């Protein structure tokens, strides 16, 4: 049986990249469990322990095929999976601001083997002192959950990603993945 994309799938395409392979529900659930754990850590213990959780995160078993995707296809997959990561975030932290949104997306995509990173930045010209900092998620330098121009108005303070995922992508090698 041939997999048919929904009629609205063109809205999620970031380029003319080929369609990524579908993500089985079992992998989505495992990635969502990691996202829920990470969100609880962020809520209860703050950014320090939460960003260490992301750095130490290992992709879930079965995610090798997504880690090997070329960047345009991986970005397209990431855009298609945003709903799942944000569903977990909306359940656990309905009023979560940019850090919670970006963090949940980065954890979810990293669990799928994509080298997504959370970017924390300071506004260059503060219009509102209450919101002088901002956060977004990036994959291969492309902003996933904000306007692409956000990179121009902020000075990056910190970029956090899953060390194993980023190292594997940089080295172009496969690393054995730990199971939970």
Where are the regions a protein language model picked out?
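Hydrophobic/aromatic-rich core segments of domains that either
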Residues: 84, 103-180
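A short, contiguous structural element within a folded domain that forms the immediate neighborhood
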Residues: 77-84
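N-terminal accessory/pre-domain segments preceding catalytic cores
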Residues: 1-67, 84-94, 111-112, 120, ...
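Long amphipathic N-terminal alpha/beta scaffold segment
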Residues: 68-69, 75, 105, 112
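A generic helix-loop boundary/linker signal
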Residues: 74-75, 127
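Short coil/turn segments at secondary-structure boundaries
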Residues: 72, 93-96
């Amino acid at each position: 049986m041939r997999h048919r994309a929904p009629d609205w799938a063109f809205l999620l395409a970031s380029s003319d990249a080929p369609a990524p392979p579908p993500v089985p529900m079992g992998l989505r659930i495992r990635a969502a469990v990691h996202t829920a754990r990470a969100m609880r850590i962020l809520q209860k213990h703050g950014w320090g322990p939460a960003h260490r959780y992301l750095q130490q995160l290992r992709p879930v078993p079965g995610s090798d095929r997504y880690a090997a995707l070329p960047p345009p296809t991986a970005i397209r997959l990431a855009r298609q999976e945003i709903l799942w990561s944000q569903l977990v975030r909306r359940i656990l932290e309905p009023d979560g601001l940019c850090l919670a949104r970006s963090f949940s997306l980065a954890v979810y995509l990293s669990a799928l083997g994509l080298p997504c990173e959370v970017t924390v930045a300071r506004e260059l010209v503060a219009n509102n002192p209450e919101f002088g900092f901002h956060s977004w998620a990036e994959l291969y330098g492309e902003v996933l959950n904000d306007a692409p121009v956000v990179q121009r108005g902020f000075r990056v303070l910190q970029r956090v990603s899953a060390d194993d995922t980023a190292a594997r992508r940089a080295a172009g090698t496969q690393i054995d993945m730990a199971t939970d």
